[in-house]
Amino acid sequence: MSKALEIRGLRKVYDNGFEALKGIDLCVEEGDFFALLGPNGAGKSTTIGIICSLVKKTAGSVSVFGHSIDSELALAKKEIGIVPQEFNFSNFESVWDIVVNQAGYYGLTRELAEQRAETYLRQLDLWEKRNTASRMLSGGMKRRLMIARALVHEPRLLILDEPTAGVDIELRRSMWAFLKEINQRGTTIILTTHYLEEAESLCRNIAIIDSGEIAENTAMKTLLKQLHRETFVLDTKEPLPDTISIAGFETHKTDEQMLEVALEKGGSLNAVFAALSEQGVEVTSMRNKANRLEELFVSLLAKS
């Protein structure tokens, strides 16, 4: 499988001496749904800016589907659709004109531009707003408009910088469904987000960047398995005592008849069952509670 994005030794030092990127390497395979996570100031936006030729790199190389941004910039840019974090279109243009005019920058005929504009506006539930000035749209509609604009020339690589910031939960999930659909049709997607649930739900692979360096770069499933502890939820037959303590284990009473127990991966719950039995508590069922990406994110940044 070919590489949609290949970054080698990428550095960026700003005029004030701040080193935003410290020689990072990053590869994204064609067809992947890839998450780039990191705290504010970690280097995410700088990386995206360089990929899209909005920021000038200090050193290193960037290729998009084999096209170097140094020697084949025009070809590289044709492969990319970018959905920036901030709204960056005219407040007075209509939804229709914003999408159709964007297609013109990539050499599409008017007829083809209009066909694609209709397709994406319908898919993103904006067709009824096509003659509306962008300033009249809600924040969620503006987000969807930016996605339609980014897709109208049908790039093979879509980059989304915080695409659901400020979007309500229902709309966010509908956007997730749309992004999954276009990824399944073959579009490679790179996502930056502060909603860790978003990355966990959508992405197959993930890189975590911190202080201009890659702290982790692996499959999402592999990353989640790296958590050192597992949490189990125990349901009990009788109400639990007001206070309950089990030596050597971290416990948390979440309901009258529900107890969470954390232990090292591979550890045994036998001692927990024995301790509860001694306190007159019978366990009726047990389930593993999935560790969330937030925990791992904090853990990795602490290590780096």
Predicted regions mapped to residue ranges:
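Catalytic Walker B motif of ABC-type/P-loop ATPase nucleotide-binding domains
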Residues: L158-D161
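Conserved ABC ATPase "signature" region
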Residues: V100, G104, E111-K129
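Conserved catalytic motifs of ABC-family nucleotide-binding domains
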Residues: E154
